[in-house]
């Protein structure tokens, strides 16, 4: 969380090259904590001149939210109803955006109070607990930081694992269907797949590319890849959108509100589609003019929520009860609509580096601080390479990885996005006086987050038990953003 940054700083052109020459950003953060005033001034000046612009921040924010989960939202709307589904998505978008604003405000408050240039999620929670009126929370405040760091690492690396599965599965589907793919898109013919190599070999094939991408440690350079990912996914969504609006049948047969028994399925799928709170403070910390961040945050979440509602509602209107787990499975088997999968492969490939950035900025400074400046860069790059290899190996070795990660994500994602922020607001401002309405609001949001934890955990456990004997080596990615 940055306090003073020049709004008029010249925009630095981002160049597509690996930032391997300069000293690692993570090492710079460690140095910036040095009590030596010379080092501190130099680091702060560097941050002012090399921060990211408002547009770059918006690009990263949109990309941090828009992942594979949007493809499953039409089925989620089916489980809620054609009226209840879009309304619920709107409410979830507003709550998620509000929780992000809470986190930013609390971080700003402690930066001003403690005279610090920036503050991450873990620091903010630690100082929030330290300022609470409860003595037990004050004495155990450091555990709040450790818990947040653990949740962030598990969640973000979990996304990276599932992205590898998504890349391999979608490329494999396109290759296997290539012989039956036609030029004409007027008929939705049955696809006869031609068996090819195992999907796990596709995962290994992506590993060298992912290894190069995670070496990019500069958010300004990552903007190029985030922009490419946004364009790829936007084009694919436009292709999907133009198809589903061509033949929308009479919607009067669709239920306005679905059965309460299926609503938890909607809730469990939709709540994790808004999971990007882990990238909020890292982006805000890197901005040249952090005062503009709340506006950019609201704009970005408005774009995401609108896209979610449009794809979810229109997809269900078009296909009704025939909607599949991923809307791409309802598209005709022609090259135009097969290209949607290829575009998403490009988009997710570029997204991997951004999701990897958050856990890297937590883990690497701890290791770099233990070695001399001479070894900082080799240690930095070695840890990045080791982490991406671990995520690839987990994707290869663990059957039904998506369900295992959905189980873990039910705890960590709900805690990070909905449970911790409102409780953090209470611990931060309670001593200064809070209205009963604000306390009630924060309590209700935390209860909603806890419901997401319970529903998501039940859903993942149920799927794990039912799939134990049926699809032991199947990996799907519908529950992870």
Swiss-Prot record:
Pfam families: Aa_trans (PF01490). The keyword Transmembrane applies. Belongs to the amino acid/polyamine transporter 2 family. PANTHER family: AMINO ACID TRANSPORTER, PROTON-COUPLED AMINO ACID TRANSPORTER 2. One of its GO terms (biological process) is glycine transport. It comes from Rattus norvegicus. This is Proton-coupled amino acid transporter 2. It comes from the Eukaryota. It catalyses: glycine(in) + H(+)(in) = glycine(out) + H(+)(out); L-alanine(in) + H(+)(in) = L-alanine(out) + H(+)(out); D-alanine(in) + H(+)(in) = D-alanine(out) + H(+)(out); L-proline(out) + H(+)(out) = L-proline(in) + H(+)(in). Inhibited by L- and D-pipecolic acid, nipecotic acid, isonipecotic acid, L- and D-cycloserine, and L-2-azetidine-carboxylate.
